Amino acid sequence: MGKIIELNEALANQIAAGEVVERPASVVKELVENSIDAGSSKIIINVEEAGLRLIEVIDNGLGLEKEDVALALRRHATSKIKDSADLFRIRTLGFRGEALPSIASVSQMTIETSNAQEEAGTKLIAKGGTIETLEPLAKRLGTKISVANLFYNTPARLKYIKSLQAELSHITDIINRLSLAHPEISFTLVNEGKEFLKTAGNGDLRQVIAAIYGIGTAKKMREINGSDLDFELTGYVSLPELTRANRNYITILINGRFIKNFLLNRAILEGYGNRLMVGRFPFAVLSIKIDPKLADVNVHPTKQEVRLSKERELMTLISKAIDETLSEGVLIPEALENLQGRAKEKGTVSVQTELPLQNNPLYYDNVRQDFFVREEAIFEINKNDNSDSLTEQNSTDYTVNQPETGSVSEKITDRTVESSNEFTDRTPKNSVSNFGVDFDNIEKLSQQSTFPQLEYLAQLHATYLLCQSKEGLYLVDQHAAQERIKYEYWKDKIGEVSMEQQILLAPYLFTLPKNDFIVLAEKKDLLHEAGVFLEEYGENQFILREHPIWLKETEIEKSINEMIDIILSSKEFSLKKYRHDLAAMVACKSSIKANHPLDAESARALLRELSTCKNPYSCAHGRPTIVHFSGDDIQKMFRRIQETHRSKAASWKDFE
């Protein structure tokens, strides 16, 4: 007798659940995606005990016909595809027919649904995947699915469930991503009877960003657009000053589906270039529309991994769109705003999921470029004397931070600074800026980008240049400023100019592992672009007999090792990236440092040269070169002007 048997359907569904239903958030994702596919305009999600006791999803979608309700719990039963050709033109979020039977096999499920064409609805009750009740129900609009006692029959799965707060954070993250993917749908997330999140469903993505991350974040987001023959890109990206220490705040959407893609993440960072600090990541919401034939979503049961055709072309489109958007505006960060932001970060609570995120009454007016409050919201606030402030919604990835507070009269506007690139001061021949480079060849600042006309005042701590304009006080980091100037020179000149060499009295030896020695021996000509000439010497060794004059002798060993790391660190070598990294290092090593006194003429020359840069606002490593204190900021610090003490409700009326 043969040993191979066909597993019964209940056992097969439990095995499939191991891939599809990893945690309560997985159930929420699958059920809400079904509601989206059903054409719902309003979806309510109720959870208790972080989804372990109850997950309830209610929508106003098309609903199921009576004969389809029981069939929906059969494996690979779906209305989304009909034949193999449909696999290559998938436009829905679900299509595998695995979610409902997998969820039902590890829970107690109730489905209440009705279709517009039928006179009555249908109610189904299943336990462990086995249907116990199938009966008529009073007609309702859409579908309500309740999942109770998740993993009740697979206790081993409960062992690996983290804290309720952590599981709730995962659920919140899922709803955040789906809300960003579908701003045209109103999402409501309720935990233990408390409303966590509510979006308006009016199609305004920027308002959804404000509802999830707060108005302060939405104020610093810029719209991006781009398209070619295959892709259409829309969305928002944050200004370089708004960053986080991880990629969790980047949302990439393909045809309304949230995906994870390392290469597209890298394209976003390449679009920012050196505007970002090392190890910092922006906020971004990118929605990409693509012909379904160019995207294969049938890769993983969770459908978050997608294989893309023409991925390189899409990366180029993303990088270009972000770079063009950020190049259009003035990127000088407000000094006081940054200090206040750091203070808030220090006061952040890691987990605070019990705080409800209240309904956001704001809407964003694209014509007036501002947030405003609806009349009904003002009416509700005026009824409640205690409503003196608006709590912003600050739901984040895996943590829920303390909510920010702020008046809705604060506007989301781009700061404009009257500026000029004209400096009338002459530069002395021996000034710090004349270090043997012809800066007349540096490209002028784009007309779309502006730099303030600065009057030099003094040097602070031999490190910062104090300047003023009619817009207020400016602080310029002298090292970052000259690093930017030199970087923009070297990035175009690396490999094209001969560099003077200084003979070393005692040569340097560099010993490498064998595998690295082989790679570097093949690519050591790349070091010639920086004026570094290594020769093979002995077993797994290179010798350096001379060095370029731009490289100080005390920094030779460290700098050469950094160059070698640049070459060896990337499996997919990019000459463009190598030249960028090399130019950034050369610029940094050869620039004036902190605690270096400058005379007034040298300082003015440095400011003049900074104003001619393509991107004068940050150094090659993403640190700001200049910060701004507005006149109002200074007067507030000395309390020469005061904040008004009228209620927020009064100020809202002014902005109707």
From Swiss-Prot:
Residues 385-408 are annotated as: Disordered. GO terms for molecular function: ATP binding; ATP hydrolysis activity; ATP-dependent DNA damage sensor activity; mismatched DNA binding. Keywords: DNA damage, DNA repair. Residues 387-408 have a biased composition (Polar residues). One of its GO terms (biological process) is mismatch repair. SMART domains: DNA_mis_repair, MutL_C. GO terms for cellular component: mismatch repair complex. InterPro entries: DNA_mismatch_repair_CS, DNA_mismatch_repair_MutL, DNA_mismatch_S5_2-like, HATPase_C_sf, MutL/Mlh/PMS, MutL/Mlh/Pms-like, MutL_C, MutL_C_dimsub. SUPFAM superfamilies: ATPase domain of HSP90 chaperone/DNA topoisomerase II/histidine kinase (SSF55874), DNA mismatch repair protein MutL (SSF118116), Ribosomal protein S5 domain 2-like (SSF54211). This protein is involved in the repair of mismatches in DNA. It is required for dam-dependent methyl-directed DNA mismatch repair. May act as a 'molecular matchmaker', a protein that promotes the formation of a stable complex between two or more DNA-binding proteins in an ATP-dependent manner without itself being part of a final effector complex. Belongs to the DNA mismatch repair MutL/HexB family. This is DNA mismatch repair protein MutL.
